[in-house]
Amino acid sequence: MHTQVHTARLVHTADLDSETRQDIRQMVTGAFAGDFTETDWEHTLGGMHALIWHHGAIIAHAAVIQRRLIYRGNALRCGYVEGVAVRADWRGQRLVSALLDAVEQVMRGAYQLGALSSSARARRLYASRGWLPWHGPTSVLAPTGPVRTPDDDGTVFVLPIDISLDTSAELMCDWRAGDVW
């Protein structure tokens, strides 16, 4: 068991050299046991990366990127969390909490709300940090117009920053390739 306290370092995608970017991708893909696609990787790019290193190796990662979520007719500026991963031999060391401290700092400084799509396993962690489960229907603003995303209902969590939200209302995300939420 590792007993040190870790702090995540925030780095924008534009400031990652190619070697570090490749190391992140390799670690995240390994942490997801290969269930991390090319589009999943693309979703992590273009924003801020929270990174934790140990002896030069990346052991934990989360990204926050800008998206628009449509809520009651308003396109809200959202910090969307992607690619939360901890190397297998470092799990259980509260590294995800350090990652979330960093991405939530970005959200508080730049966005109206934070959002993410959570695995069943992680929902309790997000709720314990003040994230709210979205109870209303979810959808995506696809190229053909709004499309319901019922498979994502119950997986979305939000962190209101400077806005009040009714979590039983409809919530729509912007379009992208791959998993839209």
From Swiss-Prot:
Binding residues annotated for substrate, in chain numbering: D35, E82, G83, S117, D151, D152
Q: What class of enzyme is it?
A: transferase
N-acetyltransferase domain spans which residues?
11-162
Give GO terms: molecular function aspect only.
Answer: aminoglycoside 2'-N-acetyltransferase activity; aminoglycoside N-acetyltransferase activity
Entry-linked InterPro entries? Acyl_CoA_acyltransferase, GNAT_dom
> Which residue positions does the secretion signal occupy?
none
* Keyword Transferase tagged: yes
In which residues is CoA bound?
Answer: V84, A85, V86, R91, G92, Q93, R94, L95, V96
Keywords assigned: Acyltransferase, Antibiotic resistance, Transferase
**A GO term from the CC aspect:** plasma membrane
The record's listing under CDD domains reads: NAT_SF (cd04301)
* Top-level lineage group: Bacteria
PROSITE patterns for this protein: GNAT (PS51186)
GO BP terms: namely: aminoglycoside antibiotic catabolic process; response to antibiotic
EC number(s) per UniProt? Answer: 2.3.1.-
The family line of this record is:
Belongs to the AAC(2')-I acetyltransferase family.
Its biological purpose is as follows: May catalyze the coenzyme A-dependent acetylation of the 2' hydroxyl or amino group of a broad spectrum of aminoglycosides and confer resistance to aminoglycosides. In vitro assays show no significant increase of resistance to aminoglycosides, possibly due to low expression in a heterologous system.
State whether it acts alone or in a complex, and with which partners, per the record: Homodimer.
NCBIfam families the record matches: AAC_2p_Ic
Q: What is this protein called?
A: Aminoglycoside 2'-N-acetyltransferase
**Organism per entry:** Mycobacterium tuberculosis (strain ATCC 25618 / H37Rv)
Q: Which gene encodes it?
A: aac
